[in-house]
Amino acid sequence: MFRIVNGEDYSPAVQQRNILDFGKAPSLLWTDNGSSNDRCDTGGNGRESGQDRVKRPMNAFIVWSRDQRRKVALENPQMQNSEISKRLGYDWKMLTEAEKQPFFEEAQRLRAMHRDKYPGYKYHPRRKPKRPQESLPADSSVLCSRTHIEETLYPFTYKDGCAKATRSRMESQLSHSQPTNISSSLLPQEHRSSWTILRHNRVTQATQTCGRPLLL
């Protein structure tokens, strides 16, 4: 007669994790009269204790791995449960369909017994509670790092803005520092001086380019 372990629920998604506890949990005998200590289903909302939950029937892999786990643990006392589980999973894949067939039949029988005993049973997986997200403090270091990131992403915008601001400040200072009673007679002289310098620069540039002076 096969035995089941009164442990965690066995779903395909978590069976690799659940088989780690088979060597530790107490086992119970399956009987045809349904006298095993199964509990009624509470809906799985997490408010009731684990003793009020109905355990899922074992699948073929769990049926096969119970005795195999004990055997591997006895042969390798130093092997950890995670290593044993990996080995059992590999050994199960290496079995042929004919070798797996008896365990599939036993798992089907256990499901039928479970369905007859709990006709309204519905599996409710346990959900992990969500952790609240921690809010970051908006201190000066965070603001500085955010400004640095934005400056890295948009360097030209920041540089152009700084240049425009600097130029506007310089023009403002120059406008306030210059006297208001500038004589209008100085303007033609400044214009002639600027024109002379510009003409000299153009002649020098033409001489360097063509090897002869450019007549204007």
Swiss-Prot record:
Cross-referenced Gene3D superfamilies: High mobility group box domain
DNA-binding region: 54-122
GO cellular component term, pick one: cytoplasm
Transmembrane feature ranges: none
Pfam families: HMG_box (PF00505)
Any one GO molecular function term: DNA-binding transcription activator activity, RNA polymerase II-specific
Keywords: Activator, Calmodulin-binding, Cytoplasm, Differentiation, DNA-binding, Nucleus, Sexual differentiation, Transcription, Transcription regulation
Region (Disordered): 31-54, 119-139
CDD domains, per database record: HMG-box_SoxA_SRY (cd22034)
Cellular localization per UniProt: Nucleus speckle; Cytoplasm; Nucleus
Cited function: Transcriptional regulator that controls a genetic switch in male development. It is necessary and sufficient for initiating male sex determination by directing the development of supporting cell precursors (pre-Sertoli cells) as Sertoli rather than granulosa cells. Involved in different aspects of gene regulation including promoter activation or repression. Binds to the DNA consensus sequence 5'-[AT]AACAA[AT]-3'. SRY HMG box recognizes DNA by partial intercalation in the minor groove and promotes DNA bending. Also involved in pre-mRNA splicing.
Subunit structure of this chain's protein: Interacts with CALM, EP300, HDAC3, KPNB1, ZNF208 isoform KRAB-O, PARP1, SLC9A3R2 and WT1. The interaction with EP300 modulates its DNA-binding activity. The interaction with KPNB1 is sensitive to dissociation by Ran in the GTP-bound form. Interaction with PARP1 impaired its DNA-binding activity.
Family: Belongs to the SRY family.
Name of the protein this chain belongs to: Sex-determining region Y protein
Provenance organism: Physeter macrocephalus (Sperm whale)
Encoding gene (name): SRY
